[in-house]
Amino acid sequence: MLEYRCSSVDWKPSPVVALANSSDDSQVAAAREDGSLEIWLVSPGAVGWHCQLTIHGDPNSRISSLAWCCSPSIGLPSGRLFSSSIDGSISEWDLFDLKQKIVLESIGISIWQMALAPISGFSSDVEGIKNGYLSEKSNDEEEIGSEEDGSDSDEFHEKSEEEIDRILAAACDDGCVRLYRISNLEKLTYYRSLPRVSGRALSVTWSPDAKRIFSGSSDGLIRCWDATSCHEVYRITAGLGGLGSSSEICVWSLLSLRCSVLVSGDSTGTVQFWDSEHGTLLEAHSNHKGDVNTLAAAPSHNRVFSAGADGQVILYKLSGSTNGSQDLKPSSSQKWDYIGYVKAHTHDIRALTVAVPISREDPFPDDILPDKASRKHRKKGKPVDFTYHKWAHLGVPMLISAGDDAKLFAYSIQEFTKFSPHDICPAPQRIPMQMVHNSMFNKTSLLLVQGISTLDILRLNISSDSSGRASTKSLVRVKSRDARKIICSAISNTGSHFAYSDQIGPSLFELKKNEFTKCPWSVSRRRLPELPFAHSMIFSSDCSRLIIAGHDRRIYTIDISSLELVYAFTPSREEHEGEAPTPKEPPITKLFTSSDGQWLAAINCFGDIYVFNLETQRQHWFISRLDGASVTAAGFHPWNNNALVISTSSNQVFAFDVEARQLGKWSLLNTYVLPKRYQEFPGEVLGLSFSPSPNSSSVIVYSSRAKCLIDFGKPVEEDEEYDLPNGNLSKTLEGKLVNLGLKKGKGTNRKRRLDEYQLEGKSNERKNFEILPSNHPVLFVGHLSKNSILVIEKPWMDVVKSLDNQPVDRHIFGT
C-alpha cells in the first residue's frame, strides 16, 4: 500500500502548568496554559493510557495549580477538582458536564499555589480495595505528597468525610495565605487568613496531621504556622544551605513528610531537607541548574523527587531505607542521599505527581457475552500479560512529570534510574482534522484542520512521482468570533459545508468556488437556529443534515436547506415511549453515521454507546462500557452499514451488528484471542480508516506511534515470537532458523539473516493485525484509494522548535 506523507500542518501544543491525582490515584488531571484540562487514566506501560476527558476552560485565565479532593457525600465518585488562577479566582471542573465553573470570584490578587488539608484521624490499619484492585501500598497513608495538588487519599478515616469540610489553603501574591472551606455548597466559603508577610506567598503545604501550615515566599523565608491559632511558630532562611542570598531566593515548592521532615525547592536550584518540628537544616543538595519548580514523594515517604527549569527529575532517598520501608528514623538523625537524575523533557518541568495503574474490569456486559465456558477457555489460552512492561505493574505507584514541552512522562518510583520513562502522550493536543476525498469541486481533495480559534480548509496535492509526498495549500481560513476557543468541527462529504462550535454556540458555513473572480474560494455563514454549544458534530452521509451533540446532553439534527431543527434525541439507557426523558447521561463526545444514513452512533465521554435509527427517529440500542474501558475510535463500515467497529483504550476491537443488537460473528469468535502484538499496540488509538473498495473488509487502526491493518475477512493468527517486544525466539522459530542453515549463537551475520528471514516472510504474505511503527508522531491517517493512504505526521523536533518557550539545552555561541 502506498503511503503519501505530509508534514506541512501547523501543530503547536500548549504547555502543561499543573498536575493533580485523583483520590484513588487512578487518574491524573493535567492543566494546560491555554486553559484546557485533561483527565488521563493511569495504566501500566504503554497500553491503556487514555485521555478520557478534555474540558475547554477560559484561555484568558492561566491556571497556577490544581487540587483534587474526594467528595462521595454529594454523589461525585471522582471527587471535586479545583484550580487556582493567576487572576485570583478559583474554579471547579465539572467532570460530568465537562465545564469549568467559578466557585471563588477573583480576589484581585494572583494565587500561586493551593494545598488541601489532610483529613486527620486516619487509621493506618485499614487497607483499601479501590477501583478494582487491592492496594499494594502496605501501611501507607496513600498520601502522594505532590505540592501541585496537596491531595491525599482520604477514603479511610475514623470520622465520615460527609461530616468534614475540607480546608483549602491558597498562597497569594500579596504575601497572605488564605483559607477556604470546601462544603457541599457550590461556592467556596472564606474561613480565615494567615498574617500577611513581606514578599509574595509562592508555595504552601500542610503537615500530615493538618496541625501546621508551611508557606514559602519571595523573600527567601519559609514560615511555619499553627493551623488553629494562625500564629507563626518559626521561620527558616532558605539560603542557609543553598546558593545565593536569602533576599534573592524564591521558595517555589514545599513538601511535608510523615517523618517530620520539610522539603523545600527554590530559585537557586537547591533542594533542602529541614526538621519540621524545629526548623533546623538536615541536608542541602544543589544539583539542579535552574529553579526547582516542583516536588513529590513516594507513598512510603522515603523517596523525594524534584524537578524544575533544567528539565531534570532528581531522586533523593532516605539513607538506610528499603523499598516500601516504613521504619522512618527521627528527623534529626536522617540523611537524604542524592541518587541520580533522569532527563526526558526538552523544556522546563512544571509539575510532578504520583499515580497508580488500575486493573481492568470484566470485559463485557453479561447480556452480550458468548457462553461462559467459551469465555473462560479463551481467556485461559490467551491471558493479558503485563510483564513486558518491566517496571510498570498494576497497583504499583509511578511518578508523572509534565512541563513546557507539553509532554507527560511516567517513571518507575522504585527503580527510577534503571528504566527509561514512558512517553504517555507522544502527540499532545493532536490537531483534529477531517479529509474529504473527491469533493464536489472537480474531485479536489480537501482537509479541514481545526486550530485553537481558527478553521482552515486546505487543498491536498498528491505527488505523481515516486517520492510519496503530499502537500497542502490553504484555500480559506475562518476565525471564531472574539478569538473564542473552538471545541469541535466537521465538514460534509462533498466539502460544500463545514461547521464548528465554540463555548457560545455552533456556526455553519458554506464553501463556494467561482473560477472567474480574483479570489475563487469564498465562505458564507448560514444562520442556525438557537442551539447550545456542542461537544461533537457530524454531517449526515448525504450532506443534508448537521447533527450536533449539545452540552445539555441532547443530540440535535438540523436540516441544511431550511436551517430548521428537525428533531432532537435524548440518549438514555432504557427505552422510553412518548415524551423524551430528562437528560441524565454523560455528555456525548463522539458521533458517527452510517453511509446509508440510517444509523447514528453517539458515544459519551466514559465509553457508553447509544445507537439511533435516523429513519424512525428513535433510539435503537444502548451498549454499556466495553471491557471497562473508554472508546478511543469508532466508525461504520462503508460497505456494511450495520457493522459498527469500536476500538477501546485497552486495545480491544469490537464489531457490532447494530440492526440485530448484538456482537458480530467476527467479535464472537476473535475478541478474546486478539494477537498479543495488537494488545501491546503502542500508543492510544486515535482513529480508524476504512478502505473505499466495495470488496474490502479491512480497516487501518492508527495511533500517534503506529498503524495496524485489520482484515475482518481473514483469520486471526497466532503471534510469532519475533513479533514480541522482548525479542526472545521461540523453539519453533529456532527450528526454522536451523533449517535455513543458521546456527544458534550471536553475531551480526545471524542478526542479518534473521532480519532477512522476517522481511521475506512479511513480503510474501501480509499478516492480519500487521503493525507498522511510525518514525514521527502521526496526526491523521485516511484512505485516498484502495491501495493508497494519506499520513499526516510531524517530526517532534520541528514541534519543539515552534514552541514559545525556549528549550533547556541552549547552544552557547563559541562552544
Swiss-Prot record:
Keywords: Developmental protein, Nucleus, Repeat, WD repeat
Disruption phenotype: Temperature-sensitive phenotype. Defective in embryo development and embryo lethality when grown at 22 degrees Celsius. Embryo lethality phenotype rescued when grown at 29 degrees Celsius. Germination of temperature-rescued pcn mutant seeds give plants with small and narrow-shaped leaves, abnormal leaf vein patterns, altered flowering organs and defects in the root apical meristem (RAM).
Biased composition (Acidic residues): 139-153
Compartments where found: Nucleus
Its biological purpose: Involved in auxin signaling pathway. Required for embryo development and meristem organization. Functions in the auxin pathway, integrating auxin signaling in the organization and maintenance of the shoot apical meristem (SAM) and root apical meristem (RAM).
Species of origin: Arabidopsis thaliana (Mouse-ear cress)
GO biological process, one term: root meristem growth
Pfam families reported for this sequence: WD40
UniProt repeat feature WD, residue ranges: 11-50, 58-103, 146-190, 196-235, 244-284, 287-326, 381-421, 529-568
PROSITE patterns assigned: WD_REPEATS_2 (PS50082), WD_REPEATS_REGION (PS50294)
GO cellular component, one term: nucleus
Matching InterPro entries: PCN (IPR044622), WD40/YVTN_repeat-like_dom_sf (IPR015943), WD40_repeat_dom_sf (IPR036322), WD40_rpt (IPR001680)
Designated name of the protein: WD repeat-containing protein PCN
Record PANTHER family: WD REPEAT-CONTAINING PROTEIN PCN (PTHR45086:SF1)
Annotated signal peptide: none
Region (Disordered): 137-157
